[in-house]
Amino acid sequence: MERWGFNSMLFKKEFERRCGLNKSMGSLGPIENTSEDPNLKVKNIHSCSNVDYLFGVKDIWNFISDDTFLVSDRNGDSYSIYFDIENQIFEVDNDHSFLSELESSFSSYRNSSYLNNGFRGEDPYYNSYMSYMYDTQYSWNNHINSCIDNYLQSQICIDTSIISGGESYGDSYIYRAICSGESLNSSENEGSSRRTRTKGSDLTIRESSNDLEVTQKYKHLWVQCENCYGLNYKKFLKSKMNICEQCGYHLKMSSSDRIELLIDPGTWDPMDEDMVSLDPIEFHSEEEPYKDRIDSYQRKTGLTEAVQTGIGQLNGIPVAIGVMDFQFMGGSMGSVVGEKITRLIEHAANQNLPLIIVCASGGARMQEGSLSLMQMAKISSALYDYQLNKKLFYVSILTSPTTGGVTASFGMLGDIIIAEPNAYIAFAGKRVIEQTLNKTVPEGSQAAEYLFQKGLFDLIVPRNLLKSVLSELFKLHAFFPLNQKSSKIK
C-alpha cells in the first residue's frame, strides 16, 4: 500500500508566514514566506523538490506515523491526514492523544536551554513552530476538494501555486523548467539548488537528478497558456478545443485541428496539396536560405504551405473552406498561399458553395517580395466575382493573430466577419506602430473585444459554438444539408 502525504498550504491575505510539515526531509518548517494569497496546491512529498532544513528537531517524526501528515487551522483544531491511492481512501483524523504528544515534544524543545539563553524571541525555528500551530486561517477540510482536483499535477511534482506580487506562473522556477527546459544541473552535488528572494526572505529550492529527469520526461505533456501561464495537460487540451481550462483563453490551433473541429468526419476532401513554393526571387539570408526554411517548416508541421484548402460538409452542408496555419512561417501569405486561396474561391463559385476562410497570419511573406503583395489583389478580385457576380456567401473568421496583408485583403471582405475571443487583429503590429509613429499603442486596443465595439466585425464567437453558429448562418442564406435539400426538391 502506497500512501502519499499532502503538504498543507493554508493562507490568508494578511498572512505573514505559511508553514507545514515536509515529510521527505524529516523536518518541520515554513515552506515559504509571503504576504499574499496563493492557491492551494498538492505536492508529492516523497519525490518533489524541497526547501532547506528549517527546524532543528531531528526526531520529530518519531511521533508521527510514516504514512500520516499533520495540519492545524487557525481555530486550534489539528488533523492527522493520509491519502491511500490504491484503495482511494482520503481520511482526516482528530487524535487528541497523538497531537498532545506531538505538542509536548515541541514544548520540551522550546523550554530547552537553547531557547532559554535569550534566543527564544529571535529563534526562527520557534517562530516557525508557533506560526505553524496557530497562524493559519482555513481548515484543511475546506480545501480537500482542491487537493483532489490538483492530484494530477502532484504526480509529476509541479508546484502551481501563484505568489501574487512576487512570482507568477511564468516566473515560477518549476514552471520554467517544465515549459522551457531550463537546466537545473549543478557541479556542487548530485542535485542542484537555486536561491530566490521573495518579500525579503530567502528560499532555496533543491532539485535532485531524479527531479531533472522527471521534468524533462514530462515536459512534452503540457502546454502553457499565453494569458495566465498555467499548464494545460496536452492530452485533454484538444478535447477542450485548445481553450485554457484555467482562464478560458483561446490558445492557437493548428489548421488540421480546426478542420477537424468544423468539418464533419469523413467528408474532408483537400485541394492542391502538392503545390509548393520555388523561391521565385532567390531570397537568401545570412541565417538560413529560404528553401531550407520552407523544408524545415514542412518537416515540423507536416504541411506543404501555410494554408489548407478543400471541400467538406459542416453539419451536412457542403462548404469550401480554407484554413491558415500560423505554425508554418507565421501563416505568412506567399505566392502559393495566394494561389491556393484563389483556386478555392473559384471552385466555390463554380460549384455554388458557401465559402469559409479561417485567418491566422502575420501578413505578406517578405521572402517573396512583390509576388506576395500581389496576392492581396488577386484574392480580392476573385472574391469580387464570387460575392457580387455569383451572389454567393463568404464568411471570414479572424483568429489570433490576424495582421498585415491578410487583414488588408480577404480577412475583412467577408459578408459576415467573425472573430474569436481575445483575438489579436491589426494591420500593423504594436511594435511597428510605436517605432514608426513614436507613440505608445494603448494596451488592448488591437484586441477583438475592443475592435468589436468600434464595429470592425459582426460577431465574437467562442470555439465551442462556432460550428453551430456557422450552420445557422448558412441555413439563413438558403444553404441546407444535402438530405434536407433533396427532400425539399421532391
Swiss-Prot record:
One Gene Ontology MF term: acetyl-CoA carboxylase activity
Ranges where the CoA carboxyltransferase N-terminal domain occurs: 221-490
EC number: 2.1.3.15
Pathway: Lipid metabolism; malonyl-CoA biosynthesis; malonyl-CoA from acetyl-CoA: step 1/1
Cysteine pairings via disulfide bonds: none
Known catalytic reactions: N(6)-carboxybiotinyl-L-lysyl-[protein] + acetyl-CoA = N(6)-biotinyl-L-lysyl-[protein] + malonyl-CoA
GO cellular component terms, semicolon-separated: acetyl-CoA carboxylase complex; chloroplast stroma
Zinc finger (C4-type): 225-247
Main location: plastid
UniProt cofactor note: Binds 1 zinc ion per subunit.
Binding site for Zn(2+): C225, C228, C244, C247
Family label: Belongs to the AccD/PCCB family.
Listed name of the protein: Acetyl-coenzyme A carboxylase carboxyl transferase subunit beta, chloroplastic
Organism: Solanum bulbocastanum
